[in-house]
């Protein structure tokens, strides 16, 4: 029994705005089914005596302080913006 259906694959492809053929949907269904099957095998691993791991190595990122600096004057920004109105840069709409 498949753990994922062709309809689910097509639905996810639609949500991702991907155009896939029926053959591709069938291929992805088989591939995703094998991936899910492998992930389910991990549930069978005995982890009773295993400490939870948050990081593989005992390292941590060293980052600089996040300090706000002086930005560009609004006038300079607007000079370089191809389209602006009332102190705001206008950009083309990307949402329907």
Swiss-Prot record:
Q: Which species is listed as the source?
A: Bacillus velezensis (strain DSM 23117 / BGSC 10A6 / LMG 26770 / FZB42) (Bacillus amyloliquefaciens subsp. plantarum)
Subunit comment = Heterotrimer of A, B and C subunits.
Recorded hits in Pfam families, A to Z, give:
GatC
Q: What is its EC number?
A: 6.3.5.-
* Keyword set includes Kinase: no
Q: What GO molecular functions are on record for this protein?
A: asparaginyl-tRNA synthase (glutamine-hydrolyzing) activity; ATP binding; glutaminyl-tRNA synthase (glutamine-hydrolyzing) activity
Q: Which residues belong to the signal peptide in this entry?
A: none
InterPro entries per UniProt: Asp/Glu-ADT_sf_sub_c, GatC
What biological processes does GO assign it?
A: glutaminyl-tRNAGln biosynthesis via transamidation; regulation of translational fidelity; translation
Query: What is the purpose of this protein?
Result: Allows the formation of correctly charged Asn-tRNA(Asn) or Gln-tRNA(Gln) through the transamidation of misacylated Asp-tRNA(Asn) or Glu-tRNA(Gln) in organisms which lack either or both of asparaginyl-tRNA or glutaminyl-tRNA synthetases. The reaction takes place in the presence of glutamine and ATP through an activated phospho-Asp-tRNA(Asn) or phospho-Glu-tRNA(Gln).
Could you tell me which HAMAP family the record lists for this protein?
A: GatC
Highest taxon of the lineage: Bacteria
Q: Which reaction does it catalyse?
A: L-glutamyl-tRNA(Gln) + L-glutamine + ATP + H2O = L-glutaminyl-tRNA(Gln) + L-glutamate + ADP + phosphate + H(+); L-aspartyl-tRNA(Asn) + L-glutamine + ATP + H2O = L-asparaginyl-tRNA(Asn) + L-glutamate + ADP + phosphate + 2 H(+)
Q: Name the UniProt key words of this record, in alphabetical order.
A: ATP-binding, Ligase, Nucleotide-binding, Protein biosynthesis
EC top class, as a word: ligase
So what family is this one in?
Answer: Belongs to the GatC family.
Q: What is the name attached to this protein's record? A: Aspartyl/glutamyl-tRNA(Asn/Gln) amidotransferase subunit C
Keyword Ligase appears in the UniProt entry: yes
């Amino acid at each position: 029994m498949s753990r994922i259906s062709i309809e689910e694959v097509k639905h996810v492809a639609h949500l991702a705005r991907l155009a896939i053929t029926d053959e591709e949907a069938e291929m992805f269904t088989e591939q995703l089914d094998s991936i899910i099957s492998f992930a389910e095998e991990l549930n069978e691993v005995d982890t009773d005596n295993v400490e939870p791991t948050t990081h593989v190595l005992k390292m941590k990122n060293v980052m600089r302080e996040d300090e706000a600096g002086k930005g560009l004057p609004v006038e300079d920004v607007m000079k370089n913006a191809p389209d602006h109105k009332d102190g705001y840069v206008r950009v083309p709409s990307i949402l329907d």
